[in-house]
Amino acid sequence: MGRGRVEMKRIENKINRQVTFSKRRNGLLKKAYELSVLCDAEVALIIFSSRGKLYEFGSVGIESTIERYNRCYNCSLSNNKPEETTQSWCQEVTKLKSKYESLVRTNRNLLGEDLGEMGVKELQALERQLEAALTATRQRKTQVMMEEMEDLRKKERQLGDINKQLKIKFETEGHAFKTFQDLWANSAASVAGDPNNSEFPVEPSHPNVLDCNTEPFLQIGFQQHYYVQGEGSSVSKSNVAGETNFVQGWVL
């Protein structure tokens, strides 16, 4: 009679479980050895019992087989990484391209273009979107206008304050100037009423020449000498006082 089919579940009996582990472990190690010898394969087998005990088999050594495994695994990852990166970039480009086309189409629809292919629901959605954008634009415009008006009010108040300060300064300086002008007029009037005022001596601008004790200016005339030559004779020069138009006297 053959053995019955073994149910694949955990053996609850501890002794039976330990016996089964020992039998199957030995069989597995034997099969690994046979595989390495018959097929010239590099085989490594590592087993841990439920108690944590280690059982191992390596046709060329466990460490050598593990190093070879790591090299093959890392090489496989490095070879697959560029392909995965390229595939990821391609997917990203496809997504961005689709998004760009959608944005371009939406922009054209907002400008009132390419509306022929849109249905009623799409047109209603576009209308609501335009109304919302228009409302937001109006609110922003109102806000900007209010801010500008507030700035103008501030500038108006500042200019009003400056104007008040200038007015006060002008009135103060004008009063001082008027006081100085009155003092000047009073001083001039007092000088005109009393010319002998020692504080403001005034000299005549046009003095009388006859009052000056100066001698008259003396201008002396000059004599003219004529040389008269008669016929056939020579006449010596003569001094003719009456005929020389000699001017004597005091000339004022």
Swiss-Prot record:
Q: What does the UniProt keyword field contain?
A: Coiled coil, Developmental protein, Differentiation, DNA-binding, Flowering, Nucleus, Transcription, Transcription regulation
Q: Does this entry carry the keyword Membrane? A: no
PROSITE patterns assigned to the protein according to its UniProt record, in alphabetical order: K_BOX, MADS_BOX_1, MADS_BOX_2
Q: Which GO terms describe its biological process?
A: cell differentiation; floral organ development; positive regulation of flower development; positive regulation of transcription by RNA polymerase II; vegetative to reproductive phase transition of meristem
Localization recorded for this chain is: Nucleus
Q: What is its main location?
A: nucleus
Which segments of the protein form a coiled coil according to its record?
91-173
* GO molecular function term, any single one: transcription cis-regulatory region binding
Tissue expression = Preferentially expressed in flowers.
Which residue range or ranges hold the K-box domain?
A: 86-176
Q: Which residues form the MADS-box domain?
A: 3-57
Question: Subunit comment for this entry?
Answer: Forms a heterodimer with AGAMOUS. Interacts with AGL15 and AGL16.
The UniProt function text for this chain reads: Probable transcription factor. Forms a heterodimer via the K-box domain with AG, that could be involved in genes regulation during floral meristem development.
Protein name stated in the entry: Agamous-like MADS-box protein AGL6
Tell me which species this is from.
Arabidopsis thaliana
